[in-house]
Structures are given as C-alpha cells and as structure tokens.
Regions:
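Glycine-rich, histidine-containing beta strand-loop boundary motifs that form or position
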Residues: 1, 97-99, 119-123
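C-terminal extensions of enzymes
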Residues: 247-318
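General structural feature for long, well-ordered alpha-helical segments within catalytic domains
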Residues: 3, 42, 46, 78-82, ...
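Catalytic alpha/beta core domains of metabolic enzymes, predominantly
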Residues: 116-248
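Active-site beta->alpha loop and helix N-cap motifs at the rims of alpha/beta catalytic domains
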Residues: 3-5, 10-107, 112
Length: 318
C-alpha cells in the first residue's frame, strides 16, 4: 500500500483514467474493491517489464512482489485466498505475506499451491526461521505430490532498517544509554545470524534485506547468497561512493556492539536469538506492530484517494 500510494503521488496522470474506468465499470463496488483492482492493475503492468528476465532465468529472477492486505495479518485463510488470487494475475508474481502467526500458516499453504512467496513484516531471527520452515513444508508437500518446484524462488525479507528504527525508538522511550551508532548494527546483526542458520540448514528459501538506512545495509552483505532490494536513490549513492566492493557477508558484527545491544536492549535479545520469540509472539513484537500499523495507515490513505474519485468533496470546488 505504501508503494502504491507513492506511485500514485508521482504518476497520477498515468492512472487517473484507469481509476475512473474501474469505478464506472463496477457501479456496486466499494472503495476497497476499487482500490484492490487498481493495485492489481499496477502490479500486472509492472510485472510485464520483468517478464523477459523471468523467462530467461527460468522463474528464478524477474518477479514482481505484490502485498496481501495488511488488515488480514491475523487471518491465514484470507491471506492464502488473496495470495493465490495474486499468483494467477501474471506468471511472475511474488506474493508478499507478513511473518505473523497467521502469515506463517499462509506461507506454507501458498507455497504448497505452487506460488513463490516473499515474507514481509519480518525483523527477527525467529521469524525468519519460521518462514523458512513453512516454505520447506510447502515445498515438501509439492514434491510428495509430484509437482514441480524448479521455477519457484521463495524469499524471506528481514527489514533491517526498520529493526534499527525500532531499536532507536526503544532506546529513546526507555532512556537506555548505549554508544552512539550501536543501534545501526541491530538489523545487520539479526540478518547475519539468520543467514548463518540458513546456510547451515540448507534452506531453499533465501534471505532478502530491505528498508535501507545507510551503506552498511548493502556493504556488509556483499558476497552473500541473498537478495538486496536497494531503492534507486540508494543505488545512486552507493555507485558514486568510495566504499570498497568486497565480500563482507561472513564478517561478524563487532562483538562489542552485539554485546552492548544484547545486554542493554531486551527487544534486541529476542530479535537476535533463534528462539527469542514463539510464533504466538510474532504479532506483538514492537517492530511488527509498528510496521503493520504503518502499512494499514498507508492502505487507508490509498482508499481515501479512491474515495475522492467516487465521492468528491462537495465542500470544495473541483
């Protein structure tokens, strides 16, 4: 929803007529139904740009991620139903499902049905391992049924920058005194620990780093069997920088920093330890709740844009 809202803000001239046409063609639809029709149309349009890569790479690259309704974060059945609908929109769709307790269930079901997932709203090692295990169960079910999995490319996003953000909020809220800059390593520490476990266990699911805040979120992950979704402005900065491009994925986060985060911030401890959270605790983790609230708010802003098309404000001249 956030990305769709950003696209509309920049390219409304490209979508205004399409929105009006959707509304006119479906006179009984609610603003939510119109909003999702628009989201799907945007996703299909964007996916076409990647089809050549998708075909060349036999489905392992060239996918377009489309996010399930953030309001469904507690409902595995609705996440699964919507995810499978999205998978049918184009051959190269990647289905974004939150790493909530219900989302973990949906990830297994969507994977078992043959769709590639992108787990989102994920910040902790425990969440990332639950995602990888769910994907493994789904793939095993397909294998047992004799169904092909060779073109599937599931990923689990750890939102490294948003975990850093949450550490900053906790430090300020709880008046925790630590060295300046330590919180900027929190996401990397969790990511690198999860990566080590992924490599050890040989998971088919791959880790993806998202939510960039500084160059370490790129430079410290160079050389890994990972996916980096680097926004264009950050790409330009990194390309023009003098940061040496060398393999660092196996370089541990400085021990003194990890020790400080671990000893001072309880929310870091549960994010860093593989058994730090149970699945039942995923939804209540601070970064999870904070991000879900933001995604839902962005969705409501998108719906408000659609509302202005359907019910223009009579208090102002158009």
């Amino acid at each position: 929803p956030t990305i769709v809202g950003d696209v509309l803000a920049k390219e409304m001239h490209l979508w205004r007529d399409r929105i009006s046409a959707i509304i006119a063609s479906h006179p009984t639809w609610t603003e939510d139904e119109v909003a999702w029709a628009l989201i799907e149309a945007m996703a299909v349009t964007a996916s076409q740009l990647l089809l050549e890569v998708f075909d060349r790479e036999h489905g392992l690259k060239g996918r377009l991620s489309i996010q399930t309704n953030p309001k469904f974060y507690r409902d595995a059945a609705r996440l699964t139903e919507q995810g499978l609908r999205f998978a049918g929109l184009a051959p190269n769709m990647q289905i974004k499902i939150p790493a909530t307790a219900a989302g973990i269930q949906a990830i297994e079901e969507v994977t078992a049905a043959g769709a590639s997932i992108n787990a989102t709203v994920c910040f902790t090692v425990a969440q990332s391992l639950a995602v990888a295990d769910a994907v493994a169960r789904g793939l095993a079910r397909r294998d047992a049924a004799g169904q092909d999995t060779s073109r599937m490319s599931p990923v689990c996003t750890i939102m490294v920058g948003r975990l850093d953000d949450w550490m900053g909020v906790v430090v300020k809220r709880d008046q925790i005194v630590i060295d300046p800059g330590a919180v900027h390593w929190a996401g990397l520490a969790a990511f690198k620990r999860a990566y080590g476990v992924y490599q050890q266990r040989g998971y088919r699911c791959r880790l993806l780093a998202a939510a960039y805040r500084h160059h370490l979120h790129w430079s410290e992950l160079i050389g890994g069997d990972v996916v980096l979704t680097i926004p264009w402005p950050w790409q330009k900065q990194f390309n023009s920088s003098d940061i040496e491009v060398s393999e660092r994925i196996d370089h541990p986060v400085p021990g003194a920093i990890v020790d400080q985060l671990h000893s001072h911030i309880p929310d870091f401890r549960v994010a860093y330890e593989p058994d730090g959270l149970t699945e039942a605790q995923f939804d209540g983790y601070g970064a999870t709740a904070r991000t879900l609230r933001g995604f839902i708010a962005s969705y409501q802003e998108l719906v408000a844009v659609i509302r202005d098309f359907m019910l223009p404000n009579p208090d102002s001249r158009q």
